[in-house]
Amino acid sequence: MATVAAVIASTHHPFYYRASTSTGADRPPFADEWVAKITAFRETLTRARPDVLLMVGSDHFHQLWLDNMPQFLVGNAPFYDANWYNEEREFGLPRLFLKGQEDLSAHILRGGLDTGFDLAFSNELRIDHSVTCPIITLRPEADLPIVPVYTNIFAPPLPQPSRFVALGAALRSLVESWPADLRVAIIGTGHLSLELGGPRQFGPHGPDP
């Protein structure tokens, strides 16, 4: 059976990439502190020796919108196009092409039915910075297959917090029941230092707490 090699909660702050790669006067004063914190997370993931990354994030209205927003969605594709035009323009993020792990996706979708989750799926999912930024920060080689799981945190009605807790427990159980001799790292992503839709949305904020 598969093993949960690590569980990590990490930022998907879209400004990290530009801040960490800037030099001279363009480099913000908090960049070095930010890089040091991210390096510690990266070392944790490297020590775990994962074979697969199970990425739990959210779509920022790139592919899913107010009129079509599943509460919980699993990507089920052999490959994923990653990052959108506005993310390249606004944040300087590179376009990525990431390999999927379809066997684990299928196992989660089938097994989810027995754990109280009728999970939506997409065979044509294109992912955004909620998945790519943690890969850039924690696994910049981008060499591991992924399973993206999108959660609805934007379009009311939102799931209750208890459902997110239950989903986390279900994902762990499903990974551990997957009949594959592989190590899976589960990475939950988000950030606390931006005010989405508010006056501080694009302010000069540093590292997440």
Predicted regions mapped to residue ranges:
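Glycine-rich phosphate- or other oxyanion-binding loops that anchor nucleotides, phosphorylated ligands
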Residues: N123-P179
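Short connector loops/turns at beta-strand edges and beta->alpha or beta->beta junctions
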Residues: T11-Y16, N152-F154, L192
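Active-site beta-strand/loop microenvironment that shapes enzyme catalytic pockets
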Residues: P159-D208
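Flexible, glycine-rich phosphate/dinucleotide-binding loops
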Residues: H62, A155, E195
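A generic structural signal for alpha->beta connector loops
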Residues: V4, D143, D181-R183
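Beta-strand elements within well-structured catalytic alpha/beta cores of enzymes
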Residues: D51-G57, V149, L182-G190
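A short aromatic-anchored loop/beta-hairpin motif
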Residues: M1-G111, T115, L119
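Catalytic cores of processing enzymes, dominated by hydrolases/peptidases
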Residues: S105-V147, L194-P209
